[in-house]
Structure formats: C-alpha cells, structure tokens
C-alpha cells in the first residue's frame, strides 16, 4: 500500500477546510441548544430512509459488478451494516411517531439526496477503488456527526439511548481503513488514476456538507456562525 497511504493523506489534507465546515456545522449547535423543533427531526429520519435504502441498492450493485475482486468481502460487510442501519432507523422513526408508510412517502430534498445519488453513480459507472476511497474519507466524518447528534438527542431531547442505535452503528463503527486502503491500492495497480480517487472523495464530502445544509434549512437554522 505504498502508493495509497500518501495519496489518502494528501486527499484528507486537501479537504481539511471542507471537513471543518461539516464538523462545525450550525445544525449540530442548534441541536445542542434545543433549537431544532422535534418535527424537524422527522425530516432527518425521512431523508435518511431514502439515503440508506438507496445506498443498500448501490452497495449491492458494486458487489454485483465487481464481486469477483478481493473487495467483495468488504462490500458484503458494508451491505450488512447498511441493512442494520435501516432497521435501526425505523426504530428511531417509531419513537418520533413515524410509521414505515410515512417514510415511504416522505419527499426527498434534492440537496439531501445528492449524496446517495453520487454513491449510486459510483456504483454504476465507477470502480470499487473509487467508492472505497470516498468512504474511507467520508464515513469517519459521518460517524463523528452521528456521535454529536446522538449526544444532543439524548441530552436535550430526552430520547432513550436504546432508540439511538442508528447513530451508534456509525459513531462506533470499527475501523475499516486497512481494508479500504487495500482496495484503493488494488485499483491503482489496475491502472486507475489517482485523480479519480481524489475526485470521488472530494465529491462525496461535498455532498455530505450539502446534506447538513439541507437539514439546517429544513429546521430554519441559519448556516452562518457554524460551530
């Protein structure tokens, strides 16, 4: 993995400002100050229902397309994690008074849905290395967001920890760095240009920011003064 480690380090360095905008997003501060109305939490759950449902199909697609590569075991684990997340999300939805039928008719927000649309694009047109590289950069960021959100929901909204398993799955996700690095290296060895790994990570991280911007907008949280 001699090529991959410095490549990922450069990507992370290049995306530091974007990472800071996500981790310091005003939406999290609003949650921690109980300024997000409980009804707006339903928006988060409704959007995640569409995202996770889409990502399940996308991971199944990349597994179908490139399932003869060594990366198949990685994608099987990711697929199982997404399935568990969808079940946990439905438990959270029930706590907020939402039925599965409510989630299925919840209208996707374009800015919130961009993330899973790009994951689907990578699964259809990209490589396992591009998607693994994008996840390698993005999922730790998403996990940190989930950690901050579960703490706020438990402390400020009195939501029982037992119903916050959706956030636990991502916030406490075991490290998959070595597996993802190996997949990226395998892609480079097959001739994949480094710029495509960088592009996939940059785009997905940008769509992550768009998701939180959409959540802030839906909750009437000003995006300036992020903290």
What spans do the regions from the language model cover?
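Acidic, low-complexity proline/glycine-rich segments
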Residues: 1-27, 106, 110, 175-179
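Charged/polar positions within long, soluble alpha-helices
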Residues: 53, 57-60, 87, 91-94, ...
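Accessory, usually C-terminal, subdomains that scaffold auxiliary metal cofactors
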Residues: 179-191
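Acidic, carboxylate-rich catalytic segments that either coordinate divalent cations
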Residues: 194-227
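Alpha-helical bundle segments that constitute or directly flank the non-heme di-iron/ferroxidase center
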Residues: 16-23, 31-65, 125, 130-147, ...
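Active-site-proximal alpha-helical scaffolds that flank and shape metal-associated catalytic sites
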Residues: 70-172
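Short, charged, low-complexity loops and linkers
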Residues: 1-7, 30-42, 97, 125-129, ...
